[in-house]
């Protein structure tokens, strides 16, 4: 058995050599490890020695901002010289969900070829929010504005039922079309009044594109029903209306349920939505009776048996905590 003195001598001899080998190993391997880590190209690794760590955060933030500013919407399909243009007329007004509604609608319209979006704001001037959104979409658009006079609105939360929201804005769009295209224009096109809170199937736009005079189809979630629809006979002609609310209206149809040939709009220059003396639910009739008769209507969507548009409504956000304790920045655009 080795003596204690011999064990101590062995330890004193081996320990220095162990330390030397360890130091040598570290000095050889460390540069290799550093090289592998730098391959990740972390900007923090590339910073100069002694630099302020906050500068790394600022650098990262700048990179993120560049990515954001370079983002663009998917561009619409290439323009075709053979397809009729669909002129989509959308009245809009300032409210918390306006940008969300217009963004959702833009994402639908971006898939439709040969589309011109006529957005008309109920405002004394065009707002920066809507202008930026339209510019960023890449859609072919026209941005108009006209403010509904106060005497056309009731004081308080309710509005005069004789002056439905969007009437003056739709009329301005009709005037713009007549001032832009000559009365005898050969430009093929279709005009569709599409509110910004509805939901639209892409199939709907292809259905309406072949409109000769006025085409019609069902609309879901209107009149207290799952859907309202034109009544079509076996010969494919519209003979009435499947609706509960005042079915004897000349055209008992929702604003989202019809499209008009552009040439008809140009030729019938007297046709507008009436501002006064029109009962609730008769706004559509006030325009259509100046354009066609019941016999002229063209049923679409499989003889008005398919639902391709839904009168959805976005729930009004409850912002009861807004402005409390500085949680949100009022300058942030929503």
Predicted segments — roles?
Residues 122-189:
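Active-site-proximal specificity loops/subdomain of glycosyltransferases
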């Amino acid at each position: 058995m080795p003596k204690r003195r011999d064990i101590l001598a062995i330890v004193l001899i081996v320990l220095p050599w162990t330390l030397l080998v360890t130091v040598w190993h570290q000095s050889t391997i460390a540069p290799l490890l550093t090289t592998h880590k730098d391959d990740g190209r972390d900007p923090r690794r590339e910073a100069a020695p002694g630099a302020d760590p906050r500068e790394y955060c600022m650098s990262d933030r700048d990179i993120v901002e560049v990515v954001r500013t370079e983002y663009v919407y998917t561009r619409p399909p290439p323009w075709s010289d053979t397809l009729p243009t669909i002129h989509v007329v959308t009245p809009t007004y300032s409210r918390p969900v306006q940008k969300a509604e217009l963004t959702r609608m833009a994402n639908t319209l971006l898939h439709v070829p040969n589309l011109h979006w006529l957005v008309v704001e109920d405002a004394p001037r065009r707002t920066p929010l809507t202008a930026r959104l339209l510019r960023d979409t890449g859609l072919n658009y026209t941005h108009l504005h006209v403010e509904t006079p106060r005497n056309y609105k009731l004081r308080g939360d309710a509005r005069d039922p004789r002056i439905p929201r969007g009437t003056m804005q739709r009329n301005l769009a009709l005037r713009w079309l007549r001032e832009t295209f000559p009365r005898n224009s050969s430009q093929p096109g279709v005009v569709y009044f599409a509110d910004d809170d509805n939901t639209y199937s892409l199939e709907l736009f292809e259905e309406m594109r072949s409109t000769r005079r006025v085409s019609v189809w069902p609309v879901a979630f209107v009149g207290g029903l799952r859907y309202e629809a034109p009544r079509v006979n076996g010969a494919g002609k519209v003979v009435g209306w499947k609706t509960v609310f005042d079915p004897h209206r000349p055209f008992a149809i929702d604003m989202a349920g019809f499209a008009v040939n552009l040439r008809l709009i140009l030729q019938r220059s007297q046709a507008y939505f009436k501002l006064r003396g029109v009962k609730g639910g008769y706004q559509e009739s006030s325009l259509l009776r100046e354009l066609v008769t019941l016999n002229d209507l063209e049923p679409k969507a499989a003889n008005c048996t398919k639902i391709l548009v839904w009168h959805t409504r976005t729930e009004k956000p409850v912002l009861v905590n807004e402005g409390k304790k500085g949680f949100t920045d009022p300058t942030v655009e929503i």
